[in-house]
């Protein structure tokens, strides 16, 4: 499903009216009606509803919802956080319709907002139609107090388009924000609906297309979409290990022995065929006991126990017989090892995954990545992204989609910005938001498992971009299945790795159910 920026949804609104004759009044009517239908479907009739409306179009949607709820038989009261004589256009028209319908309306000022929470608690549902995706400055004064009253009511809360106080493009909180149980967003989901903390504050998300023409909903100018899974290539009877990919992992050091084990073994757990691990010779005996199914290439090491630069030619030779190369997990930050990573990035002619400490090296030699002919994917978390971009961690987290797109364009590489709802950016300016995964996966080594999963999906026969996307999705799906069976607490990376086969099995045996699980619900 496509995902829109605030500016893009405004463009779609305009084109819906100008090209297709779907006027703003129609969109608002359909939006408000969909909120009313959801409320009734959740609670049933009879029911009572408080509809909190702001001064703009979001408030207009709420006024329409109030009228439809009343028509359905609900006991409705509108709390208008605006002066009625300041309303304009179709918002004013819908206010007048509410008044003519005999629906109770109370104007809320700052003084009235003080005790509003207690009254809101008397209603079965509170509809939050205070502010929508156009909000760009922190909520203050009466608006802040009203949001706090909604949050303190204890009633079921449905937000209109996006929780009031959440930035429509970033998901960041503008001072204070409504915490909704459900959100109905219109046309398409917005970035702010899917980026945290907005995604959490919105509760369960629904989309209503409000009669946008299909051509607009699928417009090629919309460059962001959800990371929907694709079917896996079949495993045919007449195949051997080489048919499922040969991966080379350059990983590990004396200090970090878990990372090389996790990435190289996860490749096999996710369906890959032949896993080869190039790591320092002193730890090979220990790793071999834990993962005898991996093929080891013992490398010379520095005095501090990292991969020595003198291994460059040998690693390059090994890469020639590999389908994909992954560099970085657990390599450490020894200067000559970082120099080795840079020269590998420049010289390896196969598709390349760079993760972990390898990203610290790339931060120094990004031009080597941008000059590569074979595709590359970088898999940073927010801290590593900060080093790669020069932005602060806070800046990265505040605008994750834009940060990933900017780096992908600059380095001509795929970027997987890990985190809640991981962002996958492509070199040509597209982005995908991944919806699988859970907080239990926030554990040491989880990223190493992801490296193996991406390599494996490429080995199974997907194109590079699809392999990156599906590697991220499968990684999250494995975490979700593990959390369902074992709980999120204590979910280790080894457990996550061991659930990769179950994730692949779910995709092969019941693909439609998996797809439905991670598809945003569309209201009829």
From Swiss-Prot:
Binding-site residues for K(+), renumbered to this chain: 58, 128, 164
Keywords associated with the record: ATP-binding, Isomerase, Lyase, Metal-binding, Multifunctional enzyme, NAD, NADP, Nucleotide-binding, Potassium
Key word Metal-binding present: yes
Residues where (6S)-NADPHX 2 binds: 330, 448
Cofactor(s) needed by this chain: K(+)
Region: NADPHX 1, residue numbers: 57-61, 132-138
A GO biological-process term: nicotinamide nucleotide metabolic process
CDD domains membership: YXKO-related
Record-annotated YjeF C-terminal domain positions: 224-507
Reactions performed catalytically: (6S)-NADHX + ADP = AMP + phosphate + NADH + H(+); (6S)-NADPHX + ADP = AMP + phosphate + NADPH + H(+); (6R)-NADHX = (6S)-NADHX; (6R)-NADPHX = (6S)-NADPHX
GO terms, molecular function: ADP-dependent NAD(P)H-hydrate dehydratase activity; ATP binding; metal ion binding; NAD(P)HX epimerase activity
E.C. designation(s): 4.2.1.136, 5.1.99.6
Co-factor binding comment: Binds 1 potassium ion per subunit.
Region feature (NAD(P)H-hydrate epimerase): 1-219
Domain spans labelled YjeF N-terminal: 9-218
Sequence segments annotated as region (NADPHX 2): 381-387
Family, per entry: In the N-terminal section; belongs to the NnrE/AIBP family.
Known function: Bifunctional enzyme that catalyzes the epimerization of the S- and R-forms of NAD(P)HX and the dehydration of the S-form of NAD(P)HX at the expense of ADP, which is converted to AMP. This allows the repair of both epimers of NAD(P)HX, a damaged form of NAD(P)H that is a result of enzymatic or heat-dependent hydration.
Protein name (database record): Bifunctional NAD(P)H-hydrate repair enzyme Nnr
Native source organism of the sequence: Thermofilum pendens (strain DSM 2475 / Hrk 5)
């Amino acid at each position: 499903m496509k995902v829109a920026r605030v500016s893009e949804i405004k463009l779609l609104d305009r084109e819906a009216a100008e090209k297709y004759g779907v006027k703003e009044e129609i969109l608002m009517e359909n939006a408000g009606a969909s909120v009313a239908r959801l409320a009734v479907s959740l609670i049933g009739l009879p029911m009572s509803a408080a509809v909190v409306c702001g001064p703009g179009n979001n408030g207009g949607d709420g006024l329409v919802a109030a009228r439809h709820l009343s028509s359905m038989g609900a006991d409705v009261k509108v709390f208008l956080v605006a002066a009625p004589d300041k309303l304009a256009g179709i918002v004013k028209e819908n206010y007048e319709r509410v008044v003519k319908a005999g629906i109770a309306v109370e104007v809320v000022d700052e003084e009235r907002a003080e005790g509003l929470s207690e009254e809101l608690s008397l209603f079965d549902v509170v509809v939050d139609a205070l502010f929508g995706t156009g909000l760009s400055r922190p909520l203050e004064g009466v608006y802040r107090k009203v949001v706090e009253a909604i949050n303190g009511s204890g009633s079921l809360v449905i937000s209109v388009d996006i929780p009031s106080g959440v930035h429509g493009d970033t998901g960041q909180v503008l001072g204070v924000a409504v915490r909704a149980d459900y959100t109905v967003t219109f046309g398409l989901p917005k970035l702010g609906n899917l980026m945290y903390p907005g995604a959490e504050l919105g509760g369960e998300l629904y989309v209503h297309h409000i009669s946008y023409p299909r051509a607009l909903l699928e417009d090629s100018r919309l460059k962001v979409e959800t990371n929907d899974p694709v079917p896996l290539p079949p495993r045919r009877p007449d195949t051997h290990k080489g048919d499922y990919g040969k991966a080379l992992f350059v990983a590990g050091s004396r200090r970090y022995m878990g990372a090389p084990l996790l990435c190289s073994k996860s490749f096999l757990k996710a369906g890959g065929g032949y896993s080869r691990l190039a790591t320092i010779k002193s730890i090979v005996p220990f790793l071999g006991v834990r993962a005898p199914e991996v093929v080891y290439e013992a490398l010379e090491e520095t005095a501090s126990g990292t991969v020595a630069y003198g291994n460059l030619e040998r690693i390059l030779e090994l890469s020639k017989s590999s389908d994909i190369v992954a560099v970085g997990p657990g390599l450490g930050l020894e200067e000559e090892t970082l120099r080795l990573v840079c020269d590998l990035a420049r010289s390896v002619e196969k598709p390349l995954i760079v993760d972990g400490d390898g990203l610290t090296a790339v931060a120094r030699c990004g031009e080597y990545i941008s000059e590569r002919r074979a595709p590359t994917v970088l898999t940073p978390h927010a801290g590593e992204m900060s080093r790669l971009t020069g932005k602060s961690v806070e800046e990265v987290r505040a605008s994750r989609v834009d940060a990933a797109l900017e780096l992908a364009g600059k380095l001509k590489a795929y970027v997987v910005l890990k985190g809640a709802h991981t962002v996958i950016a492509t070199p040509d300016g597209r982005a995908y938001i991944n919806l699988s995964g859970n907080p239990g996966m926030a554990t040491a080594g989880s990223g190493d498992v992801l490296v193996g999963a991406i390599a494996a999906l490429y080995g199974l026969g997907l194109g590079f971009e699809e392999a990156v996307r599906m590697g991220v999705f499968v990684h999250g799906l494995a975490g979700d299945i593990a959390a369902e069976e074992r709980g999120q607490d204590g979910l280790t990376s080894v457990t996550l790795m061991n659930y990769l086969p179950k994730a692949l099995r779910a995709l092969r045996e019941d693909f439609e159910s998996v797809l439905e699980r991670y598809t945003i619900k569309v209201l009829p």
